[in-house]
Structures are given as C-alpha cells and as structure tokens.
Amino acid sequence: MNIALKLTLGALAAVPLTCAAQAPKLNCTKDMSYSAEFLEKFPNASAACNEVIEANGQKWVRFNAVVKSREDHHLTVKFIDSHHNAVATMTFSFDPTARVTLDDHQQKAAASLEEGDKLLIWMPESRIGLYAKPDPSQGKHFTLLSDDTNKQEEE
C-alpha cells in the first residue's frame, strides 16, 4: 500500500474520534430544565450544578457536596459550586443500603460516611431524585428532610 493511501485511510479513521472529542459540553443553565417542583425544593440548583451529561437517554446534572454530619440514616451535606463555594446546606434521610459516589469515583455505603467526605451526586432532568451514578437502576433515593441553607447562614 502506498504512503498516500495509508495517510488518507489514517485521516479518515481519525475523523469520528475528532468529532466525538469536539461534542459540545452541556451547560448547567442553558441545557438543564429544572421543574418548578424541583426548584421549590432546591432553589440554588443552578448555582450548585457542576456538570451536565447525557446518559441512558436523558440529561443528568452533577452536584458536588461535602458531608457536614451523619447521624443514623440522616445525612447533612453542603452543596459546593464550581468555584468551591457552599451554595446550600441540606439534610436527607437515606435507605440503610444506599451507596454514594465519592469525588474519587469510589463507592461507599451512605451509613459509613464521615464529616468531610466529598460526594458526587447525580439527578436526572426528568424527575426529582438524587443518585450515586447517572443511572436510576444503580442508585437509591435520598429524601430531603430540610433545607438548612438559611439557618446555616444565620449561625
């Protein structure tokens, strides 16, 4: 095979890889549609968003959070924006078998979380629910008990 043909075939093979690498990054405010019900419970959602991806045929938003405390099956976390500022503090209850994803992508039982653990929390655009991964079959729901954001600001 001559050199020109090899170069042409190599360039054509690289085109799909180049296009995939240049797929537009989804934006937290432009590309996510938060429902009114969700925004009522999580008014700082847009500010707390760190990433939006498409997985399993739907958009998922990623929130970063730091564990403030865990007592029994109640978890209080600070949601952190992309500039590392706390934008909300909320308390959730969780199923005893629930698992979470740490910022190093390791899985950990929610019941084993400690103060300072950094979490990656996912939510699908189509419904309210917090998940360890962008896949509803892989995660357990966490139930919002209280939005402590204003209470924390007063302290």
State each model region's role:
Residues 1-9:
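Bacterial N-terminal signal peptides that target proteins for export
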Residues 10-20:
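Hydrophobic h-region of N-terminal signal peptides that target proteins for export
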